[in-house]
């Protein structure tokens, strides 16, 4: 194995959405270093920190249509039955909601929790209160996806927070999506809510750390065989 391949496999890649920020910090480091040499190294610390914020590591996703995979890195902050947001058009019956809160140190890339077809994408403007608060689901700026799966329609909602005020989503309606596939990003943390229909049982507990594209957060009843995985 060449040195280049070794380095490439060791260094976690940076998502392209982070390139402008990393470049800006690097240029600022050069300017500061020209003014006063030690400032260059201080600037480089912030440059590396920014690259870390926008890291986009590969994940090994279980390939089982009965499993619901975490859409975000972070801490499970809520597991409850609630009425889904009206803009998702998922009805008025309570659904299982599992929330994952991302802090500024978590990976910001969001991934699809199940395989299916994207039915709709709905953006709603709002406020920017602390995303850990329950009212953030109703009050904060958010972007919701509805995905048609073998178990019915599910909702995935990106929620802005106190620090994170930029939601990105590059998915499109009527597109197929795989479990663990990247579909969006929230700059500098926040929260993801997953809304699941009847038949889904949680497989995580409050406060548990979840990994996007890998951690099973819920499961639908099944009698199928062994689970395989796919890198994404």
From Swiss-Prot:
The regions listed as transmembrane in this protein's record are none
| Reactions catalysed according to its record | a 1,2-diacyl-sn-glycero-3-phospho-L-serine + H(+) = a 1,2-diacyl-sn-glycero-3-phosphoethanolamine + CO2
Keywords in alphabetical order: Cell membrane, Decarboxylase, Lipid biosynthesis, Lipid metabolism, Lyase, Membrane, Phospholipid biosynthesis, Phospholipid metabolism, Pyruvate, Zymogen
Reported EC number(s) for this entry are: 4.1.1.65
Chain positions with Pyruvic acid (Ser) modification = 190
The way it spans or sits in the membrane comes to: Peripheral membrane protein
The record's top EC class is lyase
Give one Pfam hit by family name.
PS_Dcarbxylase
> What are the catalytic residues?
190
The cofactor remark states:
Binds 1 pyruvoyl group covalently per subunit.
Instruction: Kindly tell me the pathway this chain contributes to.
Output: Phospholipid metabolism; phosphatidylethanolamine biosynthesis; phosphatidylethanolamine from CDP-diacylglycerol: step 2/2
Q: Which domain of life is it from?
A: Bacteria
Instruction: List the InterPro entries.
Output: PS_Dcarbxylase (IPR003817), PSD-A (IPR033175)
Where does the record place the site Cleavage (non-hydrolytic)?
Answer: 189-190
| S-S bridge residues | none
Which prosthetic group or cofactor does it need? pyruvate
Q: Which family does it belong to?
A: Belongs to the phosphatidylserine decarboxylase family. PSD-A subfamily.
Q: What is its biological role?
A: Catalyzes the formation of phosphatidylethanolamine (PtdEtn) from phosphatidylserine (PtdSer).
Q: What is the protein's quaternary organization?
A: Heterodimer of a large membrane-associated beta subunit and a small pyruvoyl-containing alpha subunit.
Name of the protein described by the UniProt record? Phosphatidylserine decarboxylase proenzyme
From which lineage does this chain's organism come?
Bacteria, Pseudomonadati, Pseudomonadota, Alphaproteobacteria, Hyphomicrobiales
Gene name linked to the record: psd
């Amino acid at each position: 194995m060449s040195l280049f391949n070794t380095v490439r496999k060791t260094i976690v890649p940076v998502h392209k959405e982070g390139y402008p920020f990393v470049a800006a910090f690097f240029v600022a480091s050069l300017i500061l270093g020209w003014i006063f040499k030690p400032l260059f190294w201080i600037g480089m610390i912030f440059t590396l920190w920014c690259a870390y914020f926008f890291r986009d590591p590969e994940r090994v996703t279980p390939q089982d249509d009965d499993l619901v995979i975490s859409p975000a890195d972070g801490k499970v902050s809520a597991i409850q039955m609630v009425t889904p947001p009206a803009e998702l058009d998922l009805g008025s019956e309570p659904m299982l909601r599992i929330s994952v809160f991302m802090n500024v140190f978590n990976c910001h890339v969001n991934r699809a929790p199940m395989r299916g077809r994207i039915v709709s994408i709905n953006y709603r403007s709002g406020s920017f209160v602390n995303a850990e608060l329950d009212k953030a689901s109703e009050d904060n700026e958010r972007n919701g996806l509805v995905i048609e799966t073998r178990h019915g329609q599910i909702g995935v909602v990106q929620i802005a927070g106190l620090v994170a005020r930029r939601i990105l989503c590059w998915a499109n309606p009527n597109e197929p999506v795989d479990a663990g596939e990247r579909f969006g990003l929230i700059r500098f943390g926040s929260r993801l809510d997953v809304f699941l229909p009847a038949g889904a049982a949680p497989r995580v507990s409050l406060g548990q750390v979840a990994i996007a594209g890998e951690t099973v957060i819920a499961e639908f009843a099944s009698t199928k065989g062994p689970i395989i995985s796919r890198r994404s």
